[in-house]
Design a protein with these regions (language model features):
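Conserved small/polar residues in nucleotide/adenosyl-binding loops
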Residues: 219-225
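Conserved mixed alpha/beta core segments that line enzyme active sites in large multi-domain catalysts
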Residues: 1-59, 102, 111-210
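Short, charged beta-turn/beta-strand-edge "cap" motif at the junction between a beta-strand
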Residues: 60-61, 214-217
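Contiguous hydrophobic segments
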Residues: 119, 216-219
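Active-site-adjacent segment of 2-oxoglutarate/Fe(II) JmjC oxygenases
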Residues: 74-120
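A short, polar/charged loop-to-alpha-helix boundary motif
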Residues: 63-76
């Protein structure tokens, strides 16, 4: 709803040096499917999304079909208070956020929620380990995928993620420095001393960067799927 340079004027508390956070998520994109309103301003409760969900109608219908049989120990008899999971008037981004929020609040990690909703194209990948294919097969059995151009960033509990749709139809770059991990649609969003950069690259189709705030070190997996930090 405003430009990046106006953010500190709208939220003056972020200019206070005592205001400290492990992460920040900022979204600045024009609205393609809905008219811009404050209620649809991103990031939402869990994620920010750049793209379009082409399977939105089917995803909403499937979620509505799942609702009568939803049970979870965390909510017990209060499960009906969560319904409808997706507001029928919600944008595609807001609907995806509601679905991911349901998953993380029912004890799934944010990386798991991402691969359940926006999985990789795995069926014919010979370079995938069997355990990884089995994981995606399980996810495919319990959750319909949300397909379409999608680059997402989000945070919940001890995790922050950035991930892509299975076709890689949106740009998503990352830069790893001595102190920070920065992901976004373009490289160069934040001025960084080149001497501080350890690694930079792109997040590929279906891939994900996942940061665990409780970890004391980072690990770059060699699998063609996930970069864990």
């Amino acid at each position: 709803m405003f430009l990046a340079e106006q953010l500190s004027n709208f939220y003056p508390d972020i200019q206070d040096k005592r205001f400290i956070s492990n992460f920040a998520v900022y979204h600045q994109r024009y609205s393609t499917n809905t008219f811009p309103t404050w209620s649809l301003a991103q990031p939402f409760r869990v994620i920010a999304h750049n793209g379009e969900i082409n399977t939105l109608k089917g995803n909403k219908n499937w979620m509505e079909a799942h609702e009568p049989r939803m049970i979870h120990a965390s909510y017990d008899k209060d499960i009906d208070d969560l319904k409808p999971i997706i507001d029928r008037t919600a944008s595609d981004s807001a609907a995806l956020d509601s679905t991911i929020e349901l998953l993380v609040r029912t004890k799934r990690s944010l990386p798991m929620a991402k691969l359940m909703t926006i999985p990789e194209a795995f069926a014919h990948r010979r370079d995938f380990p069997k355990k990884l294919k089995d994981l995606y097969t399980y996810a495919n059995a319990v959750m319909e995928s949300w397909d379409g151009p999608a680059a997402i960033c989000g945070c919940h509990d001890q995790w922050a993620i950035a991930g892509m749709d299975r076709n890689g139809l949106r740009p998503l770059r990352y830069t790893l420095t001595n102190d920070f991990l920065i992901t976004g649609s373009e490289t160069g969003m934040v001025e960084i001393d080149e001497a501080e950069i350890l690694e930079r690259g792109r997040v590929g189709p279906g891939q994900m960067i996942a940061v665990n705030f409780k970890a004391v070190s980072y690990t770059h997996l060699t699998l063609p799927t996930i970069l864990l930090v």
